[in-house]
């Protein structure tokens, strides 16, 4: 099987799994055959669900169903949008003792705290089945994240992926994924000398991102990004729901938004109705018995809809204006230089949104991208680019760093005072991954522990109270050489998380080493020796010379490089290592429990279907095939088993108990099914045998009628007639046995034997025709060879006759020439005699 990679877009409304196979990007379908999997997880008394199954039970199981779990990743209690996100949650978010956000959920009769990372770990674990079911086993997996994600949220996403057991090669900003999806498949449209500048508006279920990218044949770059966390389709739905609820409350005195189950029902309905306003100017809301038995009926025009959602559209307009301003001020690019504006996301289809885009950007919107799938496609392409198994066209791609990252370290000045210095490691908008090297001489280093810290720029992200991202302690040896230095590599990785990658101590020192010094005077004397001296004398001379060699010490400059230990400060944010391992183990155990419960449910459903099906057949299809004692015993066994399946006995969820309890029923019932099926198959195969006899007989008769063109001879017809005669006899005997057989016993003839006989009849009859055809072909071949040989012999004879005729002509010509010569000689002799 060829290698494949996976690109996973985790959206607020749903997720899409893309794969790259045979140089084609396509979508992996869910187990419900949908292209998108709802981002929802739920728990019940027996199992955990996600996606479509979790969404289906949202109304009835809302206290244990978490929608938009990815929106809670990494959120801290003091963040300004905590309360805003809470109004979209069915379950109240809480914080544990370590400050981790999560939800108290009752699972299997026990209420427990589940962190958002563990909930997303469940989601990843379940969605992984979508591609493993297709036989895809790969570590080349890329997951998308919103561009505004801080290090807190990025770290939380990575932990959720770790909990699920997925091996993720990288996180990718959604702007990068969209740019790849747009640019990589359009490289042929770009030029080398001029960049194409394209704007993208991504308005989804919960947030909006507007960004610009530049494209040419060699490079793609995201140059400007602006985000709004709360600006999407669900804000539209919430405002409409609030408006309709106010009208309903004024009329009936009850507020639908105050009851969670009714609120969910209303929001779901409005979400469906809202989409109709993209093509219609008016729609009706009709919900039977919404609350306290009262029906909801409301006519909503597009004009009123746009008026109600004005707070959201105002935010969107402000974001568009900010994007244009940043493009001009920071990138020095005017709107007229922008090639086009592409739309992405589920909410950009809203007419008022498209009008605002046209008004601000002065361009018609383009719809060349798949709004719901382009991010997953970009993730998949990025996974292929990073995989060693695929060769992707050579070009550079630049991501966009959302917040400036700074590094802080201690520094000893020349006067001996220690100061804390902070440098910019990665500016906002810079590409990553990226590293910087810092080298400190011994005099500049703080003794023993060297503390390095990474921060966000406070001016860019004012609402983040704790802007510390990471911290490391490097233990520098107290005793080092005088001439020594330490080189640090500070690095921002592909996930946009900073770290201290390496720390190397370089020591320069002088060391005395032994050096051999040879008596050069003796060597000169040896050179002047006469050649006539014997070899033995030379050897003795050499030994004396070695004795005179002296060992002296010489100073040599050397360098020693030592890698220093880098210790990360434990759990500045994120989950501590030990707790994370427990969550990973817990997810594995619960996944096994889910798999076992699926097997139990499947087995339980299989038993129920067996009972329902058998009850219907006992007095109908099985009437002639069931023994009296079986007819008496089997219903009792089924009734007892059925009552047990719907009892409160916990053993109904035990696979061994299900198998044990149902054993007696299958022991009595399976033989009945076996008899019935064998008799039915025997009848079917008898009919097929009769059909085969008729087909072959008709074929033989046609050949007999066409006696001038048939390839069959008398022996062939005799063979076929015998096959048909034997088959008729076999069919007659089997039919008689079938008609006389006792249906309450197994058939007297095995239906497999009749099937095999029928197949052999076809094969043997075909072999007669094939053999006849071979014989005819062989006779034809021999005849052609004889004719060819005869023709060759005739041609050879003609050639020989021509050769003989030619020889005769040549011989005749020679005789005539000789006769002519003799006549000439006679004339010459006669003339000579006359002269004399």
Q: Predicted regions span which residues?
A:
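Short, acidic/hydrophobic/Gly-rich beta-strand patch recurrent on exposed beta strands
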Residues: 104
């Amino acid at each position: 099987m060829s290698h494949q990679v996976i690109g996973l877009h985790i959206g607020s409304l749903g997720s899409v799994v893309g794969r790259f196979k045979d140089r084609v990007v396509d979508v992996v379908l869910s187990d419900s055959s949908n292209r998108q999997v709802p981002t929802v997880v739920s728990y019940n008394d027996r199992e955990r669900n996600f996606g479509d199954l979790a969404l289906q039970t949202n109304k009835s199981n809302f206290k244990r169903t978490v929608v938009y779990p990815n929106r809670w990743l990494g959120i801290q209690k003091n963040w300004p949008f905590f309360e805003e996100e809470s109004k979209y949650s069915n379950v109240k978010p809480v914080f544990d003792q370590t400050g981790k956000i999560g939800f108290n959920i009752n699972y299997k009769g026990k209420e427990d705290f589940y962190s958002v990372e563990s909930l997303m770990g469940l989601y990843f674990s379940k969605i992984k089945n979508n591609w493993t079911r297709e036989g895809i086993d790969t570590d080349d997996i890329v997951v998308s994240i919103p561009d505004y994600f801080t290090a807190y949220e990025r770290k939380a996403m990575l932990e959720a992926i770790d909990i699920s057991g997925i091996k993720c090669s990288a996180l990718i900003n959604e702007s990068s994924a969209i740019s790849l999806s747009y640019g990589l498949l359009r490289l042929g449209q770009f030029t080398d000398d001029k960049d194409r500048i394209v704007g993208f508006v991504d308005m989804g279920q919960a947030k909006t991102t507007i960004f610009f990218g530049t494209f040419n044949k060699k490079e793609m770059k995201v140059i400007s990004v602006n985000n709004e966390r709360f600006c999407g389709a669900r804000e539209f739905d919430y405002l409409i729901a609030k408006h309709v609820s106010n009208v309903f409350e004024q009329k009936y005195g009850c507020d639908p938004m105050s009851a969670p189950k009714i609120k969910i029902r209303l929001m779901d309905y409005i979400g469906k109705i809202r989409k109709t306003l993209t093509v219609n100017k008016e729609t009706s809301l009709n919900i039977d018995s919404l609350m306290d038995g009262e029906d909801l009926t409301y006519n909503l025009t597009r004009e009123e809809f746009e008026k109600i959602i004005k707070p959201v559209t105002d935010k969107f307009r402000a974001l568009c204006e900010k994007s244009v301003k940043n493009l001009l001020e920071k990138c020095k690019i005017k709107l007229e230089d922008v090639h086009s504006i592409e739309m992405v996301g589920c909410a950009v289809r809203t007419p008022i949104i498209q009008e605002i885009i046209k008004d601000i950007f002065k361009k018609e919107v383009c719809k060349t991208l798949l709004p719901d799938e382009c991010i997953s496609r970009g993730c998949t392409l990025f996974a292929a680019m990073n995989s060693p198994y695929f060769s992707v066209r050579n070009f550079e791609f630049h991501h966009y760093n959302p917040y400036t990252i700074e590094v802080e370290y201690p520094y000893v000045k020349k006067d001996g005072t220690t100061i804390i210095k902070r440098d910019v490691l990665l500016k906002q908008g810079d590409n990553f991954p990226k590293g910087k090297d810092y080298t400190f001489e011994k005099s500049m280093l703080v003794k023993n522990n060297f503390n390095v810290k990474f921060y966000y720029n406070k001016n860019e992200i004012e609402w983040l109270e704790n802007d510390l991202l990471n911290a490391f302690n490097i233990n520098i040896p107290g005793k080092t050489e005088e001439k020594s230095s330490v080189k640090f590599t500070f690095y921002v990785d592909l996930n946009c998380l900073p770290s201290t990658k390496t720390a190397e101590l370089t020591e320069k020192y002088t060391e005395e080493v032994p050096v051999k010094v040879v008596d050069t005077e003796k060597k000169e004397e040896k050179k002047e020796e006469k050649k006539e001296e014997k070899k033995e004398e030379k050897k003795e001379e050499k030994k004396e010379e070695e004795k005179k060699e002296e060992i002296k010490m010489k100073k040599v400059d050397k360098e020693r490089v030592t890698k220093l230990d880098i210790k990360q400060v434990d759990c500045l944010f994120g989950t501590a290592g030990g707790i994370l391992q427990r969550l990973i183990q817990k997810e594995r155990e619960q996944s096994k429990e889910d798999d076992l419960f699926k097997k139990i449910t499947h087995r339980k459903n299989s038993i129920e279907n067996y009972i329902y099906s058998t009850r219907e057949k006992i007095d109908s299809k099985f009437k002639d095939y069931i023994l009296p004692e079986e007819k008496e015993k089997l219903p009792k066994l089924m009734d007892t088993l059925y009552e047990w399946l719907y009892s409160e006995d916990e053993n109904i969820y035990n696979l061994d108990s299900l198998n044990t309890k149902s054993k007696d029923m299958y022991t009595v019932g399976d033989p009945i099914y076996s008899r019935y099926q064998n008799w039915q198959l025997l009848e079917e195969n008898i009919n097929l045998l009769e059909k085969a006899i008729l087909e072959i007989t008709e074929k033989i008769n046609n050949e007999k009628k066409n006696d001038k063109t048939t390839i069959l001879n008398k022996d062939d017809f005799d063979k076929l007639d015998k096959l048909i005669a034997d088959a008729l006899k076999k069919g007659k005997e089997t039919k008689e046995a079938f008609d006389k057989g006792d249906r309450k016993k197994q058939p007297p003839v095995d239906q497999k034997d009749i099937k095999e006989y029928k197949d052999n009849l076809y094969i043997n009859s075909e072999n007669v025709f094939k053999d006849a055809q071979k014989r005819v072909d062989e006779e034809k071949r021999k005849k052609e060879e004889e004719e060819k040989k005869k023709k060759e012999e005739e041609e050879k004879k003609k050639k020989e006759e021509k050769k003989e005729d030619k020889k005769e002509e040549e011989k005749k010509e020679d005789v005539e020439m000789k006769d002519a010569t003799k006549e000439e000689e006679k004339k010459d002799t006669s003339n000579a005699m006359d002269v004399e």
